[in-house]
């Protein structure tokens, strides 16, 4: 009788230990799964780089940045606009990311002379949206050979900071037809062709330089003045950037 009782007690003790271990393992697995579920993708750092078409000047004319931000947010891409400049204009959505690297009137020489400093201050970008390269140079009659050298140098410096950077290089949208003299149009046609060459020459095994065509399909009705976007133009440009970016971004 005593032997039978002892066996029963041993069975109950072993069963209790086994159940406790199973519950502990189950809890541990739940905690691991919970940790995995809350992990988020790192935000891709995007630098909008250029002059007044990047900067914007609400309410006089628009930048594409707000419309692009909305498209990326709505699609739930993890991203962060970066830059040393802040946009202090009012926008319908208060938490719009206003960081950028656009300075009205700046030439490729000025950007080339400052890009290293900006990156050291704002952090290294994963993607750079290089708006209207050479646009202000043409308008201010800078030597064209120097313009091309500056664009190459800007890209070289960005790639030195991040050998895996993606650079989106614009074929810039034209100015108003009343503003485009035959000479200006010829120069813009040349730089459009050279932008394609620059992208090919600057692409490396790890860093892609891709072209986005803002010129084809762009109309006078998209401009607030002879050079800058109105809201329609900003949406047009943002949509083209968005289409390119979806090839490189992953959703959360």
Language-model segment annotations:
Residues 53-149, 189:
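Conserved SGNH/GDSL esterase-like catalytic core that processes O-acyl groups on lipids
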Residues 2-10:
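Sec-dependent signal peptide recognition
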Residues 49-53, 82-87, 130-135, 170-175, ...:
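Active-site-proximal beta-strand/loop segments in catalytic clefts of secreted hydrolases
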Residues 16-43, 251-252:
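Bacterial Sec-dependent N-terminal signal peptides
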Residues 174-213, 231-235:
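Substrate-gating cap/lid alpha-helix
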Residues 46-49, 111, 225-252:
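Histidine-centered active-site loop/cap adjacent to the catalytic His
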Residues 42-45, 75-80, 123-129, 161-168, ...:
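Loop/turn elements at helix/coil->beta-strand transitions in domains of secreted/extracellular proteins
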Residues 131-136, 155-190, 213-215:
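Active-site segments of SGNH/GDSL-like serine hydrolases
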